[in-house]
Amino acid sequence: MRTSKASVTQTWLLYTQLCLWKDLIIRYVRQIIRRAKSMLFSQNMVADSAEISVIDVKSHLSVAKDPSNFQIAEIRIHDSICIDIPSSEETPLLESIKSCSATTIEEHVTEFVPNISSGSYADKGDYREYMEDEHICIDDLSDHLGSSFYRFPVPMAFYGVFDGHGGSDASQYIKENAMSLFFEDAVFRQSPSVVDSLFLKELETSHREAYRLADLAMEDERIVSSSCGTTALTALVIGRHLMVANVGDCRAVLCRKGKAVDMSFDHKSTFEPERRRVEDLGGYFEGEYLYGDLAVTRALGDWSIKRFSPLGESLSPLISDPDIQQMILTEEDEFLIMGCDGVWDVMTSQYAVTFVRQGLRRHGDPRRCAMELGREALRLDSSDNVTVVVICFSSSPAPQRRRIRFCVSDEARARLQTMLEG
């Protein structure tokens, strides 16, 4: 009877050790997979999917089941990873996965198309008597434009932030006339079979012309006072193509895997290329202000400062020509922040990206994120009007990385390493 009890005890101890080893093997394999995927995405490595085999080992820890009972499940990933799993006749725990080590993943590559949602927030702030900012948020541009325009077979969206100075007339004019200024061009009435490089080039040309026409329209004193002007930051999304155009010191910042990517440059004296451009044209700064009066080096309006020749070529350092950045969105691009200088005067691009990303992880609402970021700028003592637009390119926020911790004795670790090395 004693012998029987001792045998049962030894069997139970052996079974317990086997369960522990099995669990450690599972964790070890999954750790290898995570590290390999992390290395792949961080280094942009590409491998032939035909040579790849990845398995996900799932265990069922139940005393009623055989401890060697593993479930091998194929998993899908966007890129290819190769993991070698050793097999040995002396390691029965791995016998069940040895035959699966040549499993090939069928890689389903689909073109990323953003699922767009947005939110905005605006506040005149504690130090300004009037609100001079305006903004636009259109998540479904095709529906907004109506039947007279070509309905693109991909999502279209349009956003703008306009920071007025010398009054709100100029920023209000751009907002109220944005659809006719930016989308009356023939490029939006044609039917392109594909959004290719030729179409995108025509789109950029059309956008530059829209900025020029908007500036010329405000030359008329009956529309806008000559002492009034505005910055203009716009973002146009067509499928997975993003185009950002900027005149002035509003800023657009893209979040790519948590990192801030500036999609525009501040047109002001602190931006060295702009300072050189102004000075090369005979302009000068008093402190950080153009002619001691204007905080920006590019703007729409401000005709009391601009001088034009009869041919329409600008002779003034103050111009309305936008900087335009284009890019193709991927799964790594999470959201875009657009804000006036009242935001960027008190925080960096990375600060804003981290702040919004944390908000999206908490509640997933871009409207609430825009409000929280705007209020954060006010909390940091912004002295200007504050306007924020947050555009999400995915319906779900980036998940936080799970961290699994477990402790293994030196003896168990050594035995596991010996077993894995065969």
Curated annotation (Swiss-Prot):
The keyword Magnesium applies. Gene3D superfamilies: PPM-type phosphatase domain. Disulfide bonds: none annotated. GO terms for molecular function: metal ion binding; protein serine/threonine phosphatase activity. Binds 2 magnesium or manganese ions per subunit. Keywords: Hydrolase, Magnesium, Manganese, Metal-binding, Protein phosphatase. Residues 117-393 form the PPM-type phosphatase domain. It catalyses: O-phospho-L-seryl-[protein] + H2O = L-seryl-[protein] + phosphate; O-phospho-L-threonyl-[protein] + H2O = L-threonyl-[protein] + phosphate. Mn(2+) 1 binds at D163, G164. Signal peptide: none annotated. SUPFAM superfamilies: PP2C-like (SSF81606). InterPro entries: PP2C, PP2C_BS, PPM-type-like_dom_sf, PPM-type_phosphatase-like_dom. PANTHER family: PROTEIN PHOSPHATASE 2C, PROTEIN PHOSPHATASE 2C 13-RELATED. Belongs to the PP2C family. This is Probable protein phosphatase 2C 43.
